[in-house]
Amino acid sequence: INTFQLKQYSDCLSWKDIKDPPFLLCWSGAWITAETTKDNIRVVSDSLTAAEAKRGNDKRSLKSLVSYMDMADKWAGHNIKAFDSKKVMTRLILNHQSCPDLTVKQIDTLSLVKKYCKNDSNALGYWLERLGQIGKDKMESEDWDKCKAGDQKALNKMLRYNKQDVRGGVILLLELHDFLLSGGVDIFK
């Protein structure tokens, strides 16, 4: 199983307000095995270079993401079905790249918490705080703009934020797996 998260510039605009098309800034993922615990999560990632970000060119990073995705028997993430997977597919088709294997099972932790739980919020950061985990750094609007302008410091901050998302997503996934397995549901099958 691998899990991944994306960070993309321009996620929430009216199409009339889009001056520059959105593109992938970075991606991060982690392999999950039977030995994976919240204390030994190894994150892999790729980020645009400053020059790529200035041009909005995510082609190279997309290739590395698809290579990573193609090695997995399952994909997992918080809202992966409604957001991450669809954003990847959009960027791939717009970059005239091949599609990863769409028969791979997707484990969506957002769908799972909505199906089995009723928390005050279903945001990943909120779940992690409630589970006693360290919260996520904050990305401000200006950080996103700096990334798009090719600011290396902002791109590094975005990648750290993205890696935190993956670590948090794995922690929630492992918690959900153990909890649901105790009730007879194996989300990894």
Walk through the language-model features, giving the residues of each:
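Conserved RNase H-like, two-metal-ion catalytic cores of nucleic-acid enzymes
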Residues: 1-70
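Metal-dependent phosphoesterase core characteristic of DEDDh/y 3'-5' exonuclease domains
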Residues: 22-32, 39, 45-46, 74-186
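Cys/His-rich short segments
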Residues: 189
